[in-house]
């Protein structure tokens, strides 16, 4: 919950399960409540068609297996041309651009990162549906360490620790 003067202006609660076989996604399920609105995704890999079958709150249909789940902690999102929304199942084309190398300081430790910009390929999408994220990736640990974006305020996600 995000509260402003005692009033909830944003809330999100969700749960998701991803299953991989031989490093390939075969199943994804999520249920999310965002601002009291239920969102969901049920994705399964169909062996016959070799495609993902998606039943989501904003999209139902097929998607190619070159899509990745739009999860900020999956570095494969930086190599993909399409992502599946982990909240609603919508499929969006994306463009990932390298910005520059940067050092990040997280919890007193310095990390070398590659800074990327991830944007929607389709500029005609409404602003609230567009992808527009800054992502910092650490090659040494093969991890996304930070993601930031501006939508209903400025948001920043940082990885606190890892094993």
Give residue spans per PLM region.
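Acidic, serine/threonine-rich low-complexity disordered tracts
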Residues: 1-47, 77-163
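Hydrophobic, well-structured mid-protein blocks that either form specific transmembrane helices
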Residues: 30-72
């Amino acid at each position: 919950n995000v509260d402003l003067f005692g009033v909830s202006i944003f809330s999100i609660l969700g749960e998701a399960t991803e299953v991989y076989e031989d490093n390939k996604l075969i199943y994804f399920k999520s249920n999310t409540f965002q601002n009291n609105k239920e969102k969901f995704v049920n994705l399964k890999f169909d062996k016959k068609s070799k495609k993902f079958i998606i039943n989501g709150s904003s999209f139902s249909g097929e998607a190619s297996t070159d899509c990745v789940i739009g999860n900020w902690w999956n570095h494969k999102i930086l190599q993909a041309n399409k992502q599946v929304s982990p909240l609603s199942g919508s499929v969006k084309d994306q463009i990932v651009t390298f910005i520059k190398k940067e050092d990040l300081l997280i919890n007193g430790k310095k990390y070398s990162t590659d800074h990327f910009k991830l944007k929607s390929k389709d500029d005609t999408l409404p602003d609230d549906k567009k992808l527009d994220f800054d992502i910092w990736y650490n090659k040494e640990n093969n991890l996304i360490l930070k993601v930031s974006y501006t939508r209903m305020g400025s948001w920043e996600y940082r990885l606190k620790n890892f094993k």
